[in-house]
């Protein structure tokens, strides 16, 4: 891990791209054009009002057997944030002992990434299960443009982002086209895409089908979002409360409660935490990796408890990818385009294993259905044998040089001729084609939450 400490300064340079200080003197981007044509009326009269105290229960509260009675409309103060650890975890000092020989860490072996294409998706009648709504939380992997009106540099509402999206116009998605959640929503028969909750052009019909609260630059750690002035996970859960109140005004309290309880909650985050907070803070050199991962896992459990209190019952947790294979990481940590960074992949593997344990515990909760989506393996297969997936380039992105550009540094850059042959769109995010490949595996994983 010594090399990680040496390159921490380089990662800080990348994090600077997402710093709100880079926005001094800049004009806020205009709201993106609508990504589809809708016949529903705009959401007039549905303000974003803060939830009253007590509406968002403590993470320690038991799951309610029935929805709580609606609060009076006159109560509008700011909600208490979900419980956070009071102070960073500190491991106890070990007893003095003779130094042990160096421990050899064995990275994941490539044979576990079988080159065989994924099996066909499991056939489930999702319409019969009442799957009509999707609610999304997380980072840039599932942000459809919530950051567009924030004072942050973590935006993608400019070309070449979105050049292959519906209508061929940028919306704020960090891809050339649709995200995993957009494609998943279409496969579930919900909608062709999932809009951002903070999109000023959001329509009432879209509200019923679901929204994304995700924000590029966010993570499970609140400090991660502060670094880029993104919407923290706490803010996203507050937006869930506002969404629910708006939904009640549209369809009534009982119908709104039923929609939320049957909704698919998709959560995709963690990569930003591990990259732009964990490494840039130089914590890797101090050996505090497991402690930091444990803090993230504790927060995930707390956030999920709050979402369940607000009505969530079906949860899809998308794991982190092999982050050592991201073109950006290959460049900054010096492995180049020939190989992935093994230690970074070990971090991702360790985090995913702990997230799986959270999902297993959630399954033991009454009325809760949860599943983990292993995108690490899917991306690993495509990395070692891209031809089986119709890809030709897996080590660099389509935008610019493909080895460093992300967000603002991708603005206006030339792109590759055939993005559908590339795994990565920029140096950290996938093309729509790769998102389609990943979504096929997602469909294989989520059937259990609908039976």
Regions found by a protein language model. Give the residues of each.
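Intrinsically disordered, low-complexity, repeat-rich polar/charged segments
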Residues: 53-65, 72-75, 83
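Conserved active-site regions of diverse hydrolases
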Residues: 2-45, 53-55, 73, 86-88, ...
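Conserved positions within tandem-repeat grammars
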Residues: 65-66, 77, 91, 97-99
């Amino acid at each position: 891990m010594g090399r990680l400490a040496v390159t921490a300064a380089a990662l800080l340079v990348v994090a600077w791209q997402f710093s709100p200080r880079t926005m001094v003197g800049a004009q806020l981007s205009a709201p993106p054009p609508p990504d589809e044509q809708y016949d529903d009326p705009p959401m007039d009269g549905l303000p974003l009002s803060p939830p009253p105290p007590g509406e968002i229960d403590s993470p320690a509260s038991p799951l309610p057997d029935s929805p709580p009675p609606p609060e009076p409309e006159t109560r509008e103060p700011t909600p208490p944030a979900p419980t956070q650890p009071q102070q960073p975890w500190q491991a106890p000092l070990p007893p003095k002992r003779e130094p042990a020989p160096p421990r050899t860490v064995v990275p994941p072996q490539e044979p576990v990434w079988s080159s065989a294409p994924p099996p066909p998706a499991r056939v489930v009648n999702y319409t019969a299960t009442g799957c009509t709504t999707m609610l999304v939380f997380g980072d840039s992997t599932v942000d459809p443009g919530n950051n567009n009106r924030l004072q942050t540099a973590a935006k993608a509402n400019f070309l070449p982002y979105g050049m292959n999206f519906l209508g061929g116009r940028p919306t704020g998605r960090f891809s050339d086209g649709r995200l995993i959640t957009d494609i998943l929503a279409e496969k579930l028969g919900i909608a062709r895409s999932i809009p951002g909750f903070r999109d000023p052009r959001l329509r009432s019909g879209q509200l019923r089908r679901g929204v994304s609260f995700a924000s590029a630059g966010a993570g499970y750690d609140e400090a991660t979002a502060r670094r880029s002035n993104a919407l923290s996970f706490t803010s996203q859960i507050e937006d869930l409360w506002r969404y629910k109140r708006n939904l009640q005004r549209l369809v009534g309290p009982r119908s709104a409660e039923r929609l939320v309880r049957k909704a698919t909650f998709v959560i995709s985050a963690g990569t930003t935490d591990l990259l732009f907070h964990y490494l840039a803070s130089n914590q890797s050199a101090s050996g505090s990796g497991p402690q930091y991962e444990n803090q993230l896992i504790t927060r995930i459990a707390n956030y999920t408890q709050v979402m369940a209190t607000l009505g969530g019952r079906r949860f899809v947790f998308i794991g982190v990818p092999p982050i050592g294979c991201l073109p950006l990481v290959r460049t900054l940590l010096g492995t180049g385009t020939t190989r992935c960074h093994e230690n970074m992949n070990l971090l991702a593997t360790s985090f995913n294993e702990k997230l799986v344990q959270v999902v297993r515990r959630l399954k033991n909760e009454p009325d809760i259905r949860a599943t983990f989506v292993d995108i690490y393996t899917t991306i690993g297969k495509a990395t070692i044998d891209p031809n089986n997936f119709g890809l030709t380039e897996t080590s660099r992105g389509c935008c610019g040089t493909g080895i460093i550009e992300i967000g603002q540094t991708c603005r206006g850059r030339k792109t590759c001729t055939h993005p559908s042959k590339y795994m990565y769109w920029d140096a950290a995010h996938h093309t729509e084609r790769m998102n389609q490949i990943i979504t096929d595996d997602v469909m294989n994983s989520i059937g259990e939450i609908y039976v």
